[in-house]
């Protein structure tokens, strides 16, 4: 599907970018693809990636999604875009909400506008469960990013740039997530700091995150939002699973929720569930293609309306201790940390 095509990954030196490149480099995709452009701000991470991967099809572009000119110039000749650049730390965004807006909303606007201007065929925008019923600045900014993508999709004609969204739950062992924190605390013989033991989170691997984006890329229609069905766990069970894996007797210390945290996360709202397509391992939330001429809808109505529960980390499949251990032991990150323990 990428034969002789040019792909851009914004925020490409982050966890998602590394996971995509790892997948591509282990398959025939890299042989078929024309070029992969990594667009990000950090020249040190780009240099590290350039040396580590040493692949002539990788091209590196220094720039910031906040700067339209830099992203527009880098996108010349690009066929597809995976937009992963974001501010995603919830407490940080609570203290600096305008920074979240500048990157997650205005930056996304720049990426989408540049893609349309450069006649990119398809853009996949990466979002988060925190965009559903948002209570924090990060979630609010991502919700607005989704609205931007869908609004622009609604205005596209047949044959123009296709804009789709993917929503993630908690991506295990991604940068800034709780699993690296717990492992570091175990190695340093410190207490494992748990915010709220009964708090639940979806558990997705980086492999799952790539699967979701590639599924959306292959099946996405204009304005679609895609969600992968995922299991969940309480934070306490996750911490205990890591204790057992690493043979740790560290104490668990409960510290209370951080700024902007929710007790559980939702991947699909109840309103969206009423209209979502169940695709087996995924949900597709189609774009509402109606226009602002509401008079005709007073007569036609909306056919697909129902009262359904939202899809959240409390009502999805809940993993027990042994199931969480099995999931964790399949992660490359955990395997590497065990070797170095």
Swiss-Prot record:
It comes from the Bacteria. Keywords: Isomerase, Lipopolysaccharide biosynthesis. One of its GO terms (biological process) is lipopolysaccharide biosynthetic process. GO terms for molecular function: UDP-glucose 4-epimerase activity. It catalyses: UDP-alpha-D-glucose = UDP-alpha-D-galactose. Epimerizes UDP-galactose to UDP-glucose. This is UDP-glucose 4-epimerase. It comes from Rickettsia felis (strain ATCC VR-1525 / URRWXCal2).
């Amino acid at each position: 599907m990428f034969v002789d095509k040019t792909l851009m990954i914004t925020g490409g030196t982050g966890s998602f970018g590394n996971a995509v490149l790892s997948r591509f480099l282990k398959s025939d995709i890299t042989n078929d693809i024309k070029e992969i452009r990594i667009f990000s701000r950090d020249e040190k991470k780009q240099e590290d990636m350039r040396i580590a991967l040493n692949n002539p099809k990788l091209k590196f572009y220094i720039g910031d999604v906040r700067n339209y000119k830099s992203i527009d110039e880098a996108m010349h000749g690009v066929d597809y875009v995976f937009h992963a650049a974001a501010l995603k730390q919830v407490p940080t965004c609570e203290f600096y909400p305008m920074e979240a807006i500048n990157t997650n909303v205005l930056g996304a606007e720049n990426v989408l506008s540049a893609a349309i201007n450069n006649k990119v065929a398809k853009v996949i925008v990466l979002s988060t469960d925190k965009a559903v019923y948002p209570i924090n600045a990060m979630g609010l900014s991502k919700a607005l990013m989704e609205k931007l993508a869908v609004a622009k999709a609604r205005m596209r004609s047949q044959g123009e740039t296709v804009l789709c969204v993917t929503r993630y739950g908690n991506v295990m062992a991604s940068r800034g997530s709780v699993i690296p924190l717990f492992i570091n605390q175990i190695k340093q013989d410190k207490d494992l700091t748990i915010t709220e033991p009964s708090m639940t989170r979806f558990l997705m691997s980086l492999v799952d995150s790539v699967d979701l984006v590639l599924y959306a890329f292959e099946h996405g229609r204009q304005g679609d939002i895609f969600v992968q069905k995922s299991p969940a766990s309480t934070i306490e069970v996750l911490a205990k699973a890591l204790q057992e894996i690493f043979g740790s007797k560290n104490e668990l210390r409960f510290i209370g929720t951080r700024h902007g945290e929710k007790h559980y996360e939702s991947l699909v709202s109840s309103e969206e569930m009423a209209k979502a397509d169940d695709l087996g391992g995924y949900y597709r939330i189609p774009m509402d293609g109606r226009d602002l001429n509401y008079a005709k809808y007073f007569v036609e109505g909306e056919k697909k309306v129902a009262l359904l529960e939202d899809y959240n980390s409390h009502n999805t499949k809940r993993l027990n201790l042994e199931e969480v251990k099995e999931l964790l032991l399949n992660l490359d990150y955990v395997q590497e940390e065990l070797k170095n323990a």
